[in-house]
Amino acid sequence: MIDETLLEGEEKMQKAVEVAKDELATVRTGRANPAMFSGIVVDYYGSPTPLNQLASISVPEARLVVIKPYDASQLGAMEKAIRDSDLGVNPSNDGQLIRVSIPQMTEERRKEMVKLAKHKGEEGRITVRGIRRKVKEEIDRIVKDGEAGEDEGTRGEKELENLTHRYVAQIDELVKHKEAELLEV
């Protein structure tokens, strides 16, 4: 019973790390990256649609992103959505595709992005700790109801702590990697 609870908790922690990884991918570095456009939503015939579902996004050069829409009539809406996003980039539209050149980031902007990356990492850590709390409550309930012994409960809690430390360390590693990427000039 406790092992099943731990397994469920571990799966949720893995998902939390994946979410943190995806969130960190959206933090802009000085390099072009298709993932930075994943949070952009375009008004497509009245319904909000993610940009990556409306166009192919490629990176032909380190500081250039090319967005080729599947429906050329949506170029203007896509360009507006990119311009209005918090990426701080200026797209250019040539009638067929959108080119976005990624400007060199200022030192101040880099520090802002590092702060944002740390914040997203902290959100991931909070999620993992919340999962730990729920799993611990479930283990305590199992022991209290007599479905497992005290020793099993203690072993389960130790295992839970190890899982928590492992997944928090993974998130810390992702943040550290992102920070190094941001501060690299």
Curated annotation (Swiss-Prot):
Any single Pfam family the record assigns to this protein: RRF
Family in the record: Belongs to the RRF family.
InterPro entries xrefs: Ribosome_recyc_fac, Ribosome_recyc_fac_dom, RRF_sf
Protein name in the entry: Ribosome-recycling factor
GO molecular function annotation: ribosomal large subunit binding
Keywords for the protein's UniProt record, in alphabetical order: Cytoplasm, Protein biosynthesis
Subcellular location: Cytoplasm
Any one annotated GO CC term: cytoplasm
Organism (species): Saccharopolyspora erythraea (strain ATCC 11635 / DSM 40517 / JCM 4748 / NBRC 13426 / NCIMB 8594 / NRRL 2338)
PANTHER family, alphabetized: MITOCHONDRIAL RIBOSOME RECYCLING FACTOR PSEUDO 1 (PTHR20982:SF3), RIBOSOME RECYCLING FACTOR (PTHR20982)
Function: Responsible for the release of ribosomes from messenger RNA at the termination of protein biosynthesis. May increase the efficiency of translation by recycling ribosomes from one round of translation to another.
CDD domains in the cross-refs: RRF (cd00520)
GO biological process: translational termination
